[in-house]
């Protein structure tokens, strides 16, 4: 079964409605982004969520103190590292870890070997300049077929109701990450598009 994460949650209404729609995880971006949310707001949102929905803290090149603050909050199940972090800060994280690898071409796959032995999950996103996720663009999924991936992985990057089935059938990820293509505007999700995407995922029959 494909797990579903929706990233860029900024408000209680979206968090509750998306949780009810049947997703597995919500992503909260704590780094600079149009979808940035303060940790205090995540604490507020988290109190309204059902316990079976995982919470993911999305960070970019955090210092040790930021990770310790996330750990002490007792809110999150995972930390998603979306920058060019030193391996030690990921290794020392006490929560489950997701390492984002931004894909531009085949050479992007070289990054995987740095983290293969200790992260819990990989997330593959589209590289567009220096943007940190939320680009709304897909990458060439065929590239991942040549990757030496030892861990479960999440597919991100421009996923929508229109392309989600093809994406899953092409590379068979363990999970998908929805963001900019299921929004009304940055930080405000379109629950109709999310439900439509979930329905299409649930309809897939992979041989």
Curated annotation (Swiss-Prot):
One of its GO terms (biological process) is L-tryptophan biosynthetic process. This is N-(5'-phosphoribosyl)anthranilate isomerase. Belongs to the TrpF family. It comes from Petrotoga mobilis (strain DSM 10674 / SJ95). Pathway: Amino-acid biosynthesis; L-tryptophan biosynthesis; L-tryptophan from chorismate: step 3/5. It comes from the Bacteria. Its EC number is 5.3.1.24. The gene is trpF. HAMAP family: PRAI.
């Amino acid at each position: 079964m494909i797990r579903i994460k929706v990233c860029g949650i900024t408000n209680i209404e979206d968090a509750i409605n998306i949780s009810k729609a049947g997703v597995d995880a919500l992503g909260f971006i704590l780094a600079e982004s149009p979808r940035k949310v303060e940790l205090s707001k995540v604490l507020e949102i988290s109190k309204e969520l059902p316990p079976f929905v995982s919470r993911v803290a999305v960070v970019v090149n955090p210092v040790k103190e930021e990770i310790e603050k996330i750990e002490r909050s007792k809110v999150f199940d995972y930390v998603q590292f979306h920058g060019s972090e030193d391996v030690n800060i990921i290794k020392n994280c006490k929560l489950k870890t997701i390492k984002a690898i931004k894909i531009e071409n085949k050479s992007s796959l070289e990054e995987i070997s740095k983290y293969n032995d200790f992260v819990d999950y990989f997330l593959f996103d589209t590289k567009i300049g220096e943007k940190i996720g939320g680009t709304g663009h897909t990458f060439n999924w065929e590239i991942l077929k040549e990757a030496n991936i030892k861990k479960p992985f999440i597919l991100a990057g421009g996923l929508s109701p229109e392309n989600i089935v093809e994406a899953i059938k092409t590379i068979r990820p363990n999970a998908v990450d929805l963001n900019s293509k299921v929004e009304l505007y940055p930080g405000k999700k379109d629950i109709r598009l999310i439900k439509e995407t979930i329905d299409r995922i649930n309809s897939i029959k992979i041989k």
